Amino acid sequence: MAMRVLFTGASSALGSRVLQQMLESESYSEIWCVHHRTELAVADERVRVIDLDLTSDFDLKDIPTPIDLVIHFAARTHAPDPEEYFRVNHQGTVRLAQAAHARGCRRFVYISTRCATANAGAYGQSKLAAEEELKTFAWQSLLIIRASEVYGAGGSEGIDSLISLARRWHITPMLFGSSGIEFAPLHIDDFVAIVAGAIASQKEGPIIMELCGPEDLSGPSLAWALAKRFRALPVPVWLPLLALCLRAGRQVGLNLTAPDQTERLICAKTSSARGADAIGDIRF
C-alpha cells in the first residue's frame, strides 16, 4: 500500500535529492513537503506543500490521516546563538514528533549527525537531545541516520567550502594541532542512494545507522587530497591558534564561523569509516 509521507527539509541540498529519488518509486502516494523559507520546485502531482515553523506551536490537521511516515531533514546547522540549535533541532523535532504521533504516525526517520555527542558543542548536543527524546515515543519504526561530512552538492559549508576554495583560489588549509581532527567525506550520491534505500526498507524498532564515506582522513590527508585534485597549495593552520583568533574576532563583532565550530571539528564522533554501518563507495 502506498504511503502518505511528511517530509521536512525537502528543499535543502540533501533533502531535495532524496525526495527526487523517492519520487522514482510508486511506494509513496502523497509526499507533504514542509515549506518554511525556501521554495520547493518539484513538478509531481504527489507532492503537496504545507507551511510550518518548527519553532512555533503547530498541528498537522491540514494533512489527511493517517500520516504513515515522517522524514525529518530540517535542522539548524550553523547559528551564532547556541540556543537557536536547541529551539530548532531539539524542541522543533519534539514538536514535530508529537504532532505527527497525534495524526497516527508510527514511523519516523531522523537525519542526525555523527557529531551527536555531549562534547560536540551546541549543535551536536541539540541533535543528541532530539535523538534521546525521539526514543521515548511509541514508534513502530524509528530510524536515526548519523551521517559524516557530506560533500558534492556545491554548498558553501563544510567540505564543499574547502573544495570551492581549492578550485577557485588554489589554496587549501592544512588543519593540525588536535588528534580529534578527522573527516570521513561522504559523497552526496552515496548519501542519497543509501538513505533512500534505508527509508524504502525501513525495519521495525529503533535503529541507528552510522553512515560514513569510505575512508578516514586527517586534516593533512584531506588537504593533500585537495591539493592533488585542484593543484592547490596546502597552507598549514594550527587549530589552537585559529580558535584563539576566531574567539578574539567574536569579541569585536567579527563572526566568521559559528561559535561551536571548533568543538564540532575535534569532538569524538559516534563512528568512523572503520566502524560505520553503511559506507559510501566514492573515494574522496
Identify the role of each PLM range.
Residues Q91-A129, T136-F137, L142-L143:
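Conserved Rossmann-fold NAD(P)-dependent oxidoreductase catalytic core, especially the SDR/UDP-sugar
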Residues A118-A122, I145-S161, I181-E182:
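Flexible, glycine-rich beta-alpha linker
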Residues V5-S25:
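N-terminal Rossmann NAD(P)H-binding glycine-rich loop of SDR-like oxidoreductase domains
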Residues R48-Q91, R95, A99-H101, T113-A118:
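NAD(P)H-binding glycine-rich loop region in Rossmannoid oxidoreductase-like domains
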Residues T8, V34, V70-A74, F108-R114, ...:
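SDR active-site strand-loop-helix element
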Residues G197-T257, D281-F284:
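Mid/C-terminal beta-alpha module of Rossmann-like enzyme folds, strongest
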Residues S164-L186, D190, I194-A198, E210:
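A conserved pocket-lining segment of Rossmann-fold NAD(P)-dependent short-chain dehydrogenase/reductase
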